[in-house]
């Protein structure tokens, strides 16, 4: 069991930051200013787009930011017309954050640009490495979905 724990810590502390930085963060930094938003706001739009409607608490957890920071960020995204707040019909004390057409257009445009950039990087891998890479991603996703669904 120590081996799996050590390997997990090693992956989280060494490998995951490389993956995140080289395959996602650098493009968030590059493209966010194009849309007059910061990289955290662009990440939020991507998360909201993938969830359609999301609570503030869930979005805080996914972005790993404080609720006060999220409130200011959502206020800004709302004023720019990228998201709206809607009462949660299952709990009227809460609000859901919903992406607008303009916000969805930004998220989709970023995703299209990200796909092009990632294709440039990942096509450098030979065919065997591409297969191993896809297999590793699928395996990791399957295991995480099996044991850690929320």
Where are these regions (language model features)?
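Generic structural concept
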Residues: 13-17, 41, 45, 100, ...
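Short, locally clustered residues in the helix-turn-helix/winged-helix DNA-binding domain
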Residues: 46-50, 111, 138
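Residues within helix-turn-helix
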Residues: 56-57, 68, 75, 95
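Alpha-helical linker/hinge and terminal dimerization helices associated
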Residues: 16-27, 63, 106, 110-125, ...
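N-terminal helix-turn-helix DNA-binding core of bacterial DNA-binding proteins
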Residues: 25-66
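C-terminal regulatory/oligomerization modules of transcriptional regulators
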Residues: 1-6, 128-150
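N-terminal leader segment of winged-helix/HTH proteins
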Residues: 1-35
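Charged, amphipathic alpha-helical coiled-coil/dimerization segments
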Residues: 76-132
């Amino acid at each position: 069991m120590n081996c799996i724990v050590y390997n997990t810590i090693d992956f989280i502390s060494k490998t995951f930051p490389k993956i995140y930085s080289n395959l996602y963060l650098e493009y968030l930094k590059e493209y966010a200013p194009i849309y007059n938003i910061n990289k955290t706001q662009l990440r939020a739009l991507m998360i909201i787009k993938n969830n359609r409607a999301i609570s503030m608490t869930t979005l805080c957890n996914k972005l790993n930011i404080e609720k006060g920071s999220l409130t200011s960020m959502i206020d800004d995204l709302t004023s720019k017309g990228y998201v709206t707040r809607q009462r949660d019909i299952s709990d009227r004390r809460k609000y859901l954050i919903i992406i607008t057409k303009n916000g969805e257009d930004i998220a989709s445009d970023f995703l299209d640009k990200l796909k092009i950039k990632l294709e440039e990087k990942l096509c450098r891998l030979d065919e065997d490495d591409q297969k191993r890479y896809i297999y590793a991603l699928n395996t990791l996703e399957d295991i995480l979905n099996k044991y850690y669904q929320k």
